[in-house]
């Protein structure tokens, strides 16, 4: 369980009902560098989506050296069981990119999942998280700062025993089929195997590909702390507009967002 640390202020306008609408809206606001007003604005919107979905919402604040303060916005869904699954998406973008696919797409899927949790009926406790300060090219730090704080919190909440997996949704709004990535030598049956099985049940096309080095998304920090993590994102087509001005809302596609959401929902149902 995670205590609610701070209630998120409500965004003024209604939250769109689908991942594509949320991702389009967030990326239409322009770049969202770590610790900026843009990042905070996106996270307020996601916090509202979490609350509208009936989740307990908390904020985990942390310092971004030389930039200010960022945060992780955490929506908690409790079950009678002690096991835990985490689904996260980073909120920031690397200027000058408006960050539609990287990573308003992931935020959109996380927000849509929040509204579907009662229908999904997850088997384990779930933390849905909009992480902050992921873009190392902007923070200048070797770690994804929000993910590091989140992984430490998971570890403090008995993550070594409770956590089944922490999945980063990163660039899930354009290229498809997806790659499922992790820094391990071979797929683990309870992590990559379980996620791939869930994908197969709902027709989401996924191929596991080993990470280069320790990984380049928020799952990295979980693995470095000895907790199981993986990333769902772009496949062989890559992301040609990553960190560029051309990563605009018009590039987002509905199909990959729907397929990502279906896969994760099925994975959350698994025993």
What name fits each language-model region?
Residues 2-10:
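Sec-dependent N-terminal signal peptides
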Residues 13, 27-40, 61-64, 94-103, ...:
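Second-shell loop/turn segments in exported
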Residues 22-78:
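A non-catalytic alpha/beta surface segment that caps or lines the substrate-entry region
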Residues 59, 74, 85-88, 127-130, ...:
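Structural recognition of the beta-strand scaffold that forms the well-ordered cores
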Residues 172-271:
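Active-site-adjacent substrate-binding region
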